[in-house]
Amino acid sequence: MKIKSMIMVVIMMLCITINAQEQSNKTLVAYFSATGTTEKAAKLIVEVTGGTLYEIQPKKEYVTADLDWHNKSSRSSVEMSNAKLRPTLKSKPENLADYDIIYIGFPIWWNSAPRIINTFIESDNFAGKVIIPFATSGGSSISNAEKELRETYPDMKWQKGQLLNGATKEDIKKWTKK
């Protein structure tokens, strides 16, 4: 009888543990990185949070000439000069509905998020999800990009974003615990 009781207790504890794991928040770390800088930050966030990494990719990859912000005819300059322009995505993440928390990372372009971030956000239903932006930049802060995203998508559950230039794993741990 004692053995049966012990087995029942073990089975119940196992069921409780499995149920708790299923109810925990699932995290997606989605990022766009034209040069690899934002990708490094995204990978650190995945290490710290245990989230799933997803690269936001344009259907047509950016080449160096596309990123020349001094050239008004470059692809990035043209995209950023038109707030309604939406570059096509190569793919969409599978099972977005399974995620509760979504980090969205990007380089700052013209003091804003690149237009492909708008494409990504508009490609699926983010209702009820916690959205946490992060960015990298050669000289701008994330504040204007974050403000624009909040204003453009007011129904999303935005959390405070973070600029992660040269961030370490410890920096990410401190930020994600806030």
List the model feature ranges, each with a label.
Residues 20-100, 111-113, 170-177:
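N-terminal beta1-alpha1-beta2 submodule of the flavodoxin-like/Rossmannoid cofactor-binding fold
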Residues 157-178:
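Glycine-rich phosphate/pyrophosphate-binding loop and the adjoining helix
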Residues 70-154:
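Helix-loop-strand module that forms the ligand-binding subsite of alpha/beta enzymes
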Residues 52, 127, 156-159:
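Secondary-structure boundary/capping positions in well-ordered alpha/beta enzyme cores
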Residues 32-34, 56-59, 105-108, 134-137, ...:
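Active-site-proximal beta-strand/loop segments in catalytic clefts of secreted hydrolases
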Residues 1-23:
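Bacterial Sec-dependent N-terminal signal peptides
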